[in-house]
């Protein structure tokens, strides 16, 4: 009876049951203090196992606050006419680049007209009518549907793109009105964050709706070799899906267009300053809007996983040694047996050790 009670007491799976949840609880608390919010335990565990990471450009690598840098009008339109067309069209869009043009025009006291039959084609451009005159704005492929673009203006756009700017073409009444270039500055910690991600052995990919030349210029500045440009929202999701086949993949973004990819990824990380849809779709939210918090989240996940393994190891060692001892299997050879009282003490100590080992995470930075 004594042996039976001792085995029953010492085999209580408290240490094993506490090994994982206590470490995860401490990890979540540490993350919250650093402005890294894990929505679920799976995200906390998978982040440290990631092999690939996909970064959206606008609002993630860059500040997401672009500004107009160049205004080039054609011979058939004045600068004011180009800006008025641009202001009227872009005022109907919520895209960050559109907001940059609107702010620029408002600052320069440019007038605007009412746009009818407005249509926004995600990833391509805008179209509508101003006083029954058809107008359009977008990338080179999109505006080719409405007008011919001479080599001179194509060269101008390529030059601007090579400087890391995003050129947008504007068409009015079937004629090219001009080009407006917008530039988004890099976040202060983007270069260091990408460097740390690569040092962790992650395959880093940048996604952007910008053209290839602009995308490559930005990628070179931050040290990213793999770039996918001219992407639409569904293409972002496809890229993430393909990378997930090669291992656990993290997607980092902040916009409405990133939501499908964030949902598709094994771990979706939303920048805190992003849209509500992106934040809802993500598994992790970075409150501080800093890209450097991504490698911090990965390091935290790795520490938690290591701690869980340590807890499970010692919990199993405790059971492997304690249960045979409580059952009296060692008594014929050593004369040692464990009373129920000491069995209860050993069980309590094992749980205490697991909890203290998990709390030890708080000592790490």
Language model features by range: what are they?
Residues 1-55, 228-229, 299, 303-365:
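Hydrophobic alpha-helical transmembrane segments
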Residues 16, 60-61, 176:
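Hydrophobic "anchor" residues
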Residues 20, 58-63, 208-209, 232:
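Ser/Thr-glycine-rich phosphate-binding loops at phosphate-binding pockets of nucleotides
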Residues 28, 67-71, 86:
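Short hydrophobic beta/alpha edge segments that flank linear recognition/processing sites
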Residues 38, 50, 130-132, 164-166, ...:
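Conserved ATP-binding TGD loop and adjacent catalytic N/P-domain core of P-type ATPases
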Residues 43-70, 262:
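Asp-based phosphoryl-transfer active-site loop
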Residues 72-200, 212, 224-240:
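P-type ATPase nucleotide-binding
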């Amino acid at each position: 009876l004594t042996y039976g009670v001792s085995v029953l007491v010492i085999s209580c799976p408290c240490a094993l049951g506490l090994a994982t949840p206590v470490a995860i609880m401490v990890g979540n608390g540490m993350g919250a203090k650093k402005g890294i919010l894990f929505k679920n335990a799976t995200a906390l565990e998978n982040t440290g196992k990631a092999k690939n990471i996909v970064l959206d450009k606008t609002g993630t690598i860059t500040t997401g606050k672009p500004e107009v840098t160049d205004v080039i009008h054609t011979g058939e339109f004045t600068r004011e006419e180009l800006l008025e067309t641009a202001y009227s069209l872009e005022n109907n869009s919520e895209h960050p680049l559109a907001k940059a043009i609107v702010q620029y025009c408002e600052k320069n006291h440019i007038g605007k007209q009412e746009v009818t039959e407005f249509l926004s084609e995600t990833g391509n451009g805008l179209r509508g009518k101003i006083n029954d005159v058809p107008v359009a704005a977008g990338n080179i492929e999109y505006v080719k549907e409405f007008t011919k673009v001479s080599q001179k203006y194509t060269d101008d756009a390529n030059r601007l793109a090579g400087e890391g700017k995003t050129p947008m073409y504007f068409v009015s009444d079937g004629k090219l009105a001009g080009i407006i270039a917008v530039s988004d500055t890099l976040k202060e910690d983007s270069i260091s964050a990408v460097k740390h991600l690569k040092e962790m052995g992650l395959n880093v990919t940048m996604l952007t709706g910008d053209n290839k030349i602009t995308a490559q210029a930005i990628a070179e500045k931050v040290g990213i070799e793999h770039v996918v440009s001219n992407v639409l929202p569904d293409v972002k999701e496809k890229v993430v899906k393909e990378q997930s086949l090669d291992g656990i993949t993290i997607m980092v973004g902040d916009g409405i267009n990133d939501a499908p990819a964030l949902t598709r990824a094994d771990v979706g990380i939303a920048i805190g300053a992003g849209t509500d849809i992106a934040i809802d779709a993500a598994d992790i939210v970075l409150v501080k809007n800093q890209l450097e918090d991504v490698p911090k989240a990965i390091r935290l996940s790795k520490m938690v996983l290591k701690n869980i393994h340590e807890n499970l190891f010692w919990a199993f060692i405790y059971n492997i040694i304690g249960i045979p001892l409580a059952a009296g299997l060692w008594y014929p050879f050593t004369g040692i047996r464990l009373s129920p009282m000491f069995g209860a003490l050993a069980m309590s100590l094992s749980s205490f050790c697991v909890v203290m080992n998990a709390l030890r995470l708080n000592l790490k930075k």
